A protein has these predicted regions:
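N-terminal leader/capping segments at the start of a protein or of a new domain
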Residues: 1-73
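Intrinsically disordered, low-complexity acidic regions enriched in Pro/Ser/Thr
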Residues: 7, 12-28, 80, 135-138, ...
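Generic hydrophobic secondary-structure signal
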Residues: 30, 48, 130-131, 152
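Short alpha-helix boundary/capping and kink motifs at helix termini
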Residues: 33, 38, 57, 62-149, ...
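Generic structural hydrophobic/aromatic packing signal, biased to beta-strands
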Residues: 129-131, 162, 178
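Short, solvent-exposed loop/turn segments at secondary-structure junctions
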Residues: 136-137, 157-159, 185-186
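A sequence-level detector for short glycine-anchored, His/Arg-bearing signature motifs
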Residues: 146-164
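Alpha-helical oligomerization segments
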Residues: 164-187
């Protein structure tokens, strides 16, 4: 019998230390281009935009670093905004506050807008959101959620702003690209 995936447990990172960006956590972190040149052959089964936005940029703070990179499979998909918002689950994120989120990302509304706002304000985001397939649901904070099929791995800010735009009747044109990961840990 298939089991739901337990989000509310702490799993150790299994990412190979050799993949850690040089200078991670400092102002001298190597560029993605340098990092990719060193690691592309090891990660060649994954798209470069996924590797840049998730593994490289979020090396020290991804709660999904327990996923074995070598066995991940992926699929690039395109979704409409409302369908995406209905279909994805945001673990560990708490409640959304659309008006606050809108103001946070808009800042003063000019060139100082957050990059997420600048991208979505012209139709869609600049990097695909990364989602994890959870075919049997999840357990989050002790609550069983059997209908959850997709959990946000990377893209929480894009999710917050997309939600704010939809709630405030300002939905971006879209469509929105996502990368759906599948792991042998969750089957």
């Amino acid at each position: 019998m298939a089991l739901v995936f337990k989000l509310d447990r702490s799993l150790e990172s299994c990412w190979p230390v050799e993949l850690r960006p040089v200078g991670e956590g400092s102002f001298e972190k190597e560029t993605f281009e340098s990092w990719w040149a060193r690691n592309q052959s090891r990660l060649s089964h994954l798209p470069s935009d996924l590797c840049e936005q998730w593994i490289y940029k979020h090396w020290t703070n991804s709660p999904f670093d327990f996923l074995p990179l070598e066995s991940l499979t992926w699929e690039r998909q395109t979704w409409g905004g409302e369908e995406l918002l209905r279909s994805i689950y945001r673990a560990w994120g708490g409640d959304l506050h659309p008006e606050f989120d809108y103001r946070t990302f808009q800042r003063k509304g000019g060139n100082d807008r957050h990059p997420t706002a600048r991208a979505l304000d012209v139709g869609t985001w600049d990097y695909p959101m990364v989602l994890l397939s959870t075919p049997h649901g999840v357990v989050d904070f002790g609550e069983v959620r059997p209908k959850v099929r997709l959990v946000i791995v990377e893209g929480h800010q894009r999710h917050r702003y997309l939600n704010a735009l939809h709630v405030l009747n300002r939905p971006p044109m879209g469509p929105h690209e996502v990368i759906v990961l599948k792991s042998t840990l969750i089957s």
